Amino acid sequence: MKKTVLLTSATILLGVGFQAINASAAETFPKEYNTEGTITFEAGDNEITPPVDPENPDPTDPVDPIDPPGPGTGGALSIDYGSKFKFGTQKISTADQTYYAAPDEMKDGSKKPTYVQVTDKRGTLAGWKLTLSQPEQFKTATGEELVGAQLTFTKAEAASMVDEKYKPTEVSSTISLTPGVNNNLAMNAKKETGVGTWVYRFGSNEATNKEAVQLFVPGKSVKLAQQYSTKLVWALEDT
């Protein structure tokens, strides 16, 4: 009787072993276990974003203009750069004349379309607005006005390496300035647009920029053999 009990127990144990093997063979692979990767961004600091190439506005490949007006404004929402508009030296004429601004020259010898650059690194998609004003008429150093002179910006467009869906919602293709009239709209990036670096360029390359920025001077205006200059104010608002 004792042997029979032991034999029966051994048989039961062997059966359990077979069940364990069968259960293991029934497992499903591959097995999955989820982990997580995280990163948190905050608004950019006051570091100035360098000027980008207006033809190919890649922030990782900046350009170096020969004659920048000054450093950008800095900040998380900033105007990084704006071209000077140079109309050269011209002969005095008693006929109406239109003069054209030269392209923006770079230290590597290349010439680019004139432009203004805005960067939004706030991370809020809140939007912004860029306007242009000419507080006063062209004047000499002694205050003599170039009466009737008018600046017109044409072929204007927005360009960026950022996805097209973030393009500013309103882009003025032409701006005609009247001295003393403020806030002529250049670009309006409404909510959910305008993120990253954007250029407002006058022509897409040097060739199309040649006659894009115009200065009309009436023949009847008195012209002294001196340099005339005017201030242009680009204003960036948080909307």
Question: Predicted regions: what is each one?
Answer:
Residues 4-7, 21-239:
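Signature of Gram-negative chaperone-usher
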Residues 9-17:
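Bacterial N-terminal signal peptides
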